Structure formats: C-alpha cells, structure tokens
C-alpha cells in the first residue's frame, strides 16, 4: 500500500481589522493581486447597519446585498475556501464587532490590526458623513481585540513610508512568500468591492499602488475635534506596540 502524499497546507484566513478612512482597501487590493488569494470586503457591514440602525451612505444597498445574520457570516469566514486558494484575506472594520457578538471565532483567524492617527481618520470621515463618534473610528474595538488575541499592529503611516518591508513582514506573519505583485495593481473598481465602494473608494479606484505618505495635521473643530482628542490615548496605546522594522 502506498503512503498518502503530502497534504495541502491549510489555507490562511488573514483578518485585517481596521477603522474607516485608512488604507484598508489599498491593502486588500495588494493581497488580491496575488494569484493564490481571494478576498472579502467588510463582510459584517450589512449586519452592523441593520443592527445599529445607523444611516450610512448606501445603507439600503448594503443591507440588500449583504448577509445580516452575523452567525452566517462567521460560518463563511471560518469555513471551506475554494480549491487552490492559499490565503483567504478578510478586510474587516473593527467597529462592526458589536456588543453581544460571540468573538470566539476570531481566534481561529490570523489577525492583524491596522491603525491610523485618529485626527486624520476623523478629518477624512466627516467629509463623507456629517457626524462621527469614538465608536465609529473602531479604536475601542481594536484595543479590545489587542487585549483578546494580541495581534501585531501596523500603522498606516509606516506602511506607506515603506510598503515592501511591511508587506514582507505581513507575509511572514501569514506564513506565505512575498510577491512583487502586491506592490501595484490596475486602477478601477473590482467585483470584490462592496456595493458601498462608490461612496468611499474614489481614491482607491484611481490608485495603482500605495500612495506616498504625506504627513499632515488637519484642523478640526467642534465635535470632530473632541472625538479625535478622545481617541488619541487609544491610538497611542496601540501605536506603541506597532511593528517597527529595524532595517
């Protein structure tokens, strides 16, 4: 009797937990450009909108197009993937993890946190939606995830300054080889984009790679300034644990 040959490696379910107005969609583009990867774009968004009643751009479209039962969503996130797929890349918004949702499934994923200075996040967010809260930034939920599963933390500014080294580090974390295909992609929308893309993805649709980082401190006033200020301690807590490359 012949012995069985080597078994295919278990697919990597790489979950990147971001907040809004970050480079999360660009990072999804980067991974989708790999030949061995499939991606999913904010799979918990429809549940989040239905459960919270929040009025986001394209709310009705998102709910109609998505799955509103988070348990069914989770079943797909931890379930089988198509043959030949090495990486199942999951782009998540951390604030889509609502109170009362069982998070045990998160530990079955290979997790990463993607953070950005909340002053930049808030300034960008209020251009698309008039109001913003601390919860909307995803930072409270990212802090919870950091406490619960201790994932590595990437800061968007660091990634934009040195995309390739940070992508290599992320590939190492996922246990896959880096490929230069991750550094550039064709412009325009993709079938994998959520239906909300036309409200939020204009910059990504124009892009062909990671943008050059340009530091800036937006001038915020009123409630937006207060939200950003309240978020800063949460951001700093995560920022001090971020991946720092030595070379």
Model features per residue range: what roles?
Residues 1-83:
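PAPS-dependent sulfotransferase catalytic core
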Residues 1-14, 179-247:
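PAPS-dependent sulfotransferases, especially Golgi type II membrane carbohydrate sulfotransferases
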Residues 16, 20, 135, 159, ...:
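Aromatic-acidic/polar surface patches that form glycan- and anion
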Residues 47-49, 121, 188:
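Generic structural signal for helix capping and beta-alpha/helix-loop junctions
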Residues 59-115:
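A basic- and aromatic-enriched beta-loop-alpha substructure that forms the phosphate/nucleotide-
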Residues 65-73, 93-94, 134-141, 223-230:
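Soluble or luminal CAZymes and related metallo-dependent hydrolases
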Residues 90-181, 198-206:
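PAPS-dependent sulfotransferase catalytic domain
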């Amino acid at each position: 009797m012949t012995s069985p040959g080597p078994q295919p490696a278990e697919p990597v379910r790489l979950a990147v937990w971001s907040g809004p107005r970050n480079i999360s969609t660009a990072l999804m583009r980067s991974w989708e450009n790999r030949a061995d990867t499939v991606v999913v774009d904010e799979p918990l968004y429809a549940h989040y909108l239905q459960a919270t009643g929040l009025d986001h751009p394209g709310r009705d479209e998102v709910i109609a197009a998505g799955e509103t039962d988070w348990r069914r969503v989770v079943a797909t996130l931890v379930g089988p993937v198509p043959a030949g797929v090495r990486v199942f890349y999951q782009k998540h918004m951390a604030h889509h993890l609502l109170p009362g949702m069982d998070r045990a499934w998160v530990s079955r994923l290979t997790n990463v946190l993607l953070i950005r200075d909340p002053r930049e996040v808030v300034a960008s967010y209020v251009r698309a939606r008039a109001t913003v809260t601390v919860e909307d930034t995803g930072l409270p939920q990212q802090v919870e995830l950091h406490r619960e599963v201790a994932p590595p933390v990437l800061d968007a500014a660091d990634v934009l300054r040195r995309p390739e080294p940070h992508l290599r580090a992320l590939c190492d974390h996922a246990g896959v080889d880096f490929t230069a295909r991750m550094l550039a992609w064709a412009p325009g929308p993709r079938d994998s984009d959520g239906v909300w893309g036309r409200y939020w993805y204009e910059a990504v649709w124009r892009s062909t790679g990671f943008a050059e980082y340009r530091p800036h401190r937006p001038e915020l006033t009123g409630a937006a300034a207060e939200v950003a200020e309240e978020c800063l301690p949460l951001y700093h807590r995560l920022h001090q644990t971020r991946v720092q490359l030595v070379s």
